[in-house]
Amino acid sequence: MKFQKLGNTDIDVSVVALGTWGLGGGSVWTDKDSTVEDAKRLLDVCHEYGVNYIDTAPVYGTGVSEELLGKALKGRREDFILQTKCSLNWRNEGGNFHYERDGYTVNNDTRAAAVKKDVEDSLRRMGTDYLDSIIVHYVCGSFPVEETVGALEDLVREGKIRTYGLSNSQPADLAAYQEAGGRISVVQEFFSILSPFHGREYFELCKKYNTVFQTYGVLEEGFLTSPV
């Protein structure tokens, strides 16, 4: 397995990461409910092949993915680089409506208090006292970038996160976060040979800021694994 630094940090991550959307269960995350044993087997395979980068999010199964990972990581937390997300929550404490699913209303809130509460909730669900990386799940233009950056920097100083990034964003968002004093280590965007999106523009900005461009959907949900 090849490794690289996560942006400007000293964090070594495998160039392949494990996304744990499928652990969430429910109506959309996968076709079955996962167990702790499923999560443990995933981590075993990752370890076997040298994958140390694990990605999840609070809304994957409305907390389920994080909880299963937390239990599966007991006794082996230091073997993996753990990345989760903030901004999407189901606490009904404000923010912008994002979606309704499985009886929950999910809002998008990038204000300081919401970001910090998201991190505290993730730490609790996963049974750890720090996160290696936290990603703003959906960049939101309704709230000041400076406020979000300030909250993320506070969390770094407090030792609760090591670094942070963006997802579902535009190249202009990366520039705005950097100009607001942010230190964006990673951007996570949908990208494939069928859906190049704004990859080229993002690639140039990532080079400028030494930010890792992390992709999801590269196999188009399995379509690109079949003969053409």
How would you label these PLM feature ranges?
Residues M1-I81:
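N-terminal binding-site loop/beta-alpha segment at the start of enzyme catalytic domains
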Residues K32-C46, N108-M126, Q170-A175:
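Short, acidic/polar
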